[in-house]
Regions:
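Single conserved hydrophobic/aromatic residue that forms the stacking wall/gate
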Residues: 1-8, 12-13
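A donor-sugar binding/catalytic signature common to diverse glycosyltransferases
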Residues: 226-270
Length: 320
């Protein structure tokens, strides 16, 4: 399809790497769509704007938003604060595990703060965010688990699609969203483990990890498959940490932002590692050979169960 589109528009791509990248992205889009169609029970009608959402007010007793960084002031969208509901309507509103991403309350927008005040039940995904929202709204804001951690590992296993190319390969999986790909650390780890590097190529095409294999066409199931089979994972990604924990992979976690960055999103990583009892896997200095302990089981299942109970209690209270 993408080839036909390019030819039909008489577009000439001189850089073959860009053409290959477009093909990979088209394949990735198809895999995401297939995953959505197969696993997500969505309404037939798509509600794509505030005007369309207004029509839902008479159909539901409660509205729930969450999670991820839907409350980041850098990605502000009033829909995630239920601005489409009429004032005074008798509908319960719940925010489950939204993340504001940043640690600087001064970055919060005035209209964002005003809309927060109207939400009946609010929780947050990270401790620093919960404190900021609590100070803004004047109420206690509990920290709850990301929804991915509320699902049993056995259920995630069912969604795994192994990437056949690497089924018989021993590899370190790299997945970095930030511009720092921590090459010196990855190279030392490669030497120590005597295995190859597989890099998931997302936003780092110009500054990517020097890997044996570059992967840019995977969908959600293949993403799970790559983590599930990895000998070690190197990442600065929140959800790559979660799935490494779920599949019990050894992992090195890196900070995506400098501590002096006013737009730093590191606080959610710190909270997650604390909840999972995995603080020791955080690498703060690439120049030091700071390899995590070789333990067979990373994290505390007991601690996670406690957090699951607290998170479910919030949901029950909000929707009772």
């Amino acid at each position: 399809e993408i080839c036909a589109c390019l030819v039909g528009s008489e577009m000439c791509i001189r850089d073959s790497s860009k053409y290959s990248y477009l093909l990979a992205r088209a394949c990735q889009y198809r895999r995401f769509k297939e995953f959505e169609d197969k696993h997500l029970p969505l309404t037939e009608k798509i509600y794509g704007n505030q005007k369309q959402l207004v029509s839902l007010e008479q159909e539901f007793d409660a509205f729930v938003c969450g999670s991820d960084q839907i409350w980041s002031p850098l990605l502000y969208d009033p829909v995630y604060y239920f601005n489409f509901l009429s004032k005074g309507c008798n509908i319960r509103t719940v925010a489950y595990a939204p993340s504001i991403g940043i640690g600087n309350a001064l970055l919060m927008r005035k209209e964002q703060i005003a809309l927060m005040q109207n939400i009946d039940y609010i929780s947050c995904r990270e401790e620093q965010g919960a404190q900021i929202i609590g100070d803004i709204t004047g109420r206690e804001v509990p920290v709850v688990l990301d929804p991915t951690l509320m699902v049993r590992p056995a259920d995630w296993e069912k969604l795994v699609n192994p990437v056949s190319q690497f089924e018989n390969e021993s590899y370190i999986l790299c997945y970095f969203l930030g511009s720092n790909v921590h090459q010196s650390y990855v190279d030392r780890l490669r030497k120590e483990l005597c295995c190859k590097i597989v890099n998931i190529q997302m936003f780092n095409r110009l500054n990517g990890t020097n890997a044996d294999y570059q992967v840019s066409d995977i969908g959600p199931s293949e993403f799970l498959g790559l983590i599930r089979k990895a000998k070690w994972v190197c990442t600065d990604s929140f959800h790559a940490i979660i799935f490494s924990y779920i599949f019990q992979r050894r992992i090195s976690v890196f900070e995506r932002f400098k501590s002096t960055d006013t737009q730093s999103q590191n606080s959610r990583i710190y909270t997650l590692l604390n909840i999972l009892d995995m603080e020791k896997v955080l690498v703060r200095n690439d120049s030091v050979c700071n390899m995590p302990e070789r333990v067979e089981h990373l994290g505390s299942c007991t601690a996670l169960e406690k957090w699951k109970d607290l998170s479910l209690e919030f949901i029950r209270k909000a929707l009772k």
